[in-house]
Amino acid sequence: MRKGTVRSILMLGIFYFVFLGAEYYFDNMMAFVTDADGVVLAQSYVLGSSVLGFLLYAPMEKMLPAKIKRLFWSVSSVAVILMFFFIKIHSGYGHTLRAGLFLFLLLGYFGSGVHYLVAQTFAAEIETEKSHLARTVGCAYAFGILLQFINNNCISSVAAQVIFLCLAFAVMEGLFMVKAQQIETQGETHSVIEADGAARKTGMLLIFIVALMTFIFATLDNAVTLIHAGGGADIGQWPRLLLACSGLLAGFLYDIKKGAYQNIIMYCVMMLSTICVVVITCGGPFLLGLVVFYLSAGFFSIYFASSFMRLSYAMKEGKLWAGLGRAVNNLCAVGTASMSLTLLHSPSYVTIVIALVLFAITSVLIFVYQRAGDQMRWKQENAILSQEAQKTEKILETHKKNEEEWLALFAQEFSLTPREVEVLSCMLHSEDNVTEMATQLAISRAALYRHISNMNEKTNTKARIGLLQFYYAWMQEK
């Protein structure tokens, strides 16, 4: 495992621990100065404050000079630690709430920065099989949940728990500052294409998908919490380890074939959660709801975090988009909390109908998002290949060979069939998608994929872009 990957796991994992731990700690302290309804209301306020922090990171990074930024980071770090201790004093509802609002504003700011810096770690290889972005997010999430479990169950003193949170934040801040200065020195990695209408459309679709999914998962969360709060069952802390395992598993599954199966996996998890909401509403077993909730919550957290981080590469404002997943999730969780509770207290048939309608709408959006994402990735691949082609133009002039001669030499060296040479030639000269190329060649999509796969095996490459990049590199060597 690379050093940059390990640091990313540590930085993002500690952020998850500090953010979730701060939320748990704030709720416990607020319980001393208000009733249960007041705690829920205060929690919604601080989560809303964190959303503002996530949104402020990008414009502040753009406006502040480098020296002022480093000073701001240092002062903000001290302020975060002070806010933890102000909350511990809990001298009154207003003082505790104000400290919480400021604390989560700063945590949101740093959280957005952490997501962006982790995304930049994998920017250069995001379109290759070497990229492990989702896996890194999954490992970080599991690490953060494990730290929270240790803090809540192995440390009995509240003061010691707060000190542990502050020390963890200090470590995260150190990693944050080192990585941020490294990015400033090396320069930010952007997409090879400028953000256009397709990229913005994909981003808006993802926001709507995460918003609708948040409502479904918040409803399932509230269904489990209501039974726990009513004394029907004791959730305890141990099931949270299931949450860590599901997040870890999701990260590895989402990275298969550069995220090709990410949306379909999330679709299946969402379908399972929707069925579970219906089952619990109809008086089904609580244990089923508990297991499905923790499994699905881990998959969902990795989904929205890694999806927005991937999307940030195609956006002009990468600093904003990288951490937008957590911001959208927090905002929608606050905005839909009362609606999901109302839904659970409604007649069972109303809950079932609304859950199924939301599932249907989200299903359509996922399908459209998948298609839009494919088009955007295809355009990025064509842009990369166009750059490679320009590099080889001088080679063609120098060696005075036409493209047919190069193809003939390539085919001879790697034992390509005449049909495979025809397919390769079409791929080199066309920016169309697979369906249009298959029509051009008068073959089926399956046959086209089979020819590409055969050439991949002969050249020891992966996928279309890998084959073409290998061809251009081979020309340069010759």
Label every PLM stretch briefly.
Residues 457-474:
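Short, Lys/Arg-enriched C-terminal cap helix and immediately downstream tail that follows
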Residues 390, 394-450, 472-477:
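Helix-turn-helix DNA-binding segment
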Residues 261-301:
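C-terminal transmembrane helical hairpin of 12-TM major facilitator-type secondary transporters
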Residues 95-115, 285-302:
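Hydrophobic core of transmembrane alpha-helices in multi-pass small-molecule transporters
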Residues 53-70, 246-261:
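Helix-to-loop junctions at the C-terminal end of transmembrane segments
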Residues 112-127, 299-315:
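Intracellular juxtamembrane helix-capping segments at the cytosolic ends
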